[in-house]
């Protein structure tokens, strides 16, 4: 029947999703009634008058860019490894690579650390739009938290015991947050990644207002090519990969997904680094 905590969390998430749908419906209904008042508001006019960011670089409009090729190459290699790794590689390689706290998870933590360093350096050196600098600083902090989460805050590196607070609510008995309450935090991470990495770039590309809004508040948004990379990474689950290939190695799909998402965020950091250099 599965873990009771996971089942309880799943029921809660379904109820929360229904609630969000009702809220979204209410907001949409309100906008449809008072849209004239909204577009005449000073806030809307201020956002609409912002120049946006597509005029700065056409690179973010490209689909087949470096971010697309790198993220999809990583995804393709991951699928090939799952399908054929057990046939061509010895267990002395596949076992430490795929186990919990193995090489893949350690590499994911290293990539998140690089992301944090890149964003911290960008925030330190950037002297332009203040909101942009604030988001760069926030991203640097968030990715540093991701490093701690991937390493269970040093639990396996330094041999810490699982905290008493985590016992019974962490499904893997680890000192981290993303495995609490039946993977609820992990599900939030997946949903947040898909919204930020896929939905926001599409809104930005399709509607000039969203481009101006994101630019006005200083939010870095992935390119269209990277959005497809986020989509492929976020859809890497047992129920999707299992349809494509038969697994030949011991490797958690969740660990592979986190690794691919880490690569996508690294490409985002490099896109920001390139974009902020442009005049």
Model-derived segments and their meaning:
Residues 11-23, 173-196, 261:
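Hydrophobic alpha-helical transmembrane segments
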Residues 2-11, 91-94, 168-183:
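Juxtamembrane membrane-water interface segments that cap and precede transmembrane helices
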Residues 144-164:
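Transmembrane alpha-helix/helix-exit interface in multi-pass inner-membrane proteins
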Residues 2-4, 81-94, 204-208, 235-248:
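Juxtamembrane "helix-exit" motif on the non-cytosolic side of transmembrane helices
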Residues 30-33, 227-279:
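C-terminal transmembrane-bundle signature of multipass membrane proteins
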Residues 124-144, 210-224:
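Interfacial segments of alpha-helical transmembrane regions
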Residues 35-64, 206-219, 279:
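Membrane-interfacial, low-structure loops and terminal tails that flank and connect transmembrane helices
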Residues 18-26, 64-82, 226-230:
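Alpha-helical transmembrane segments
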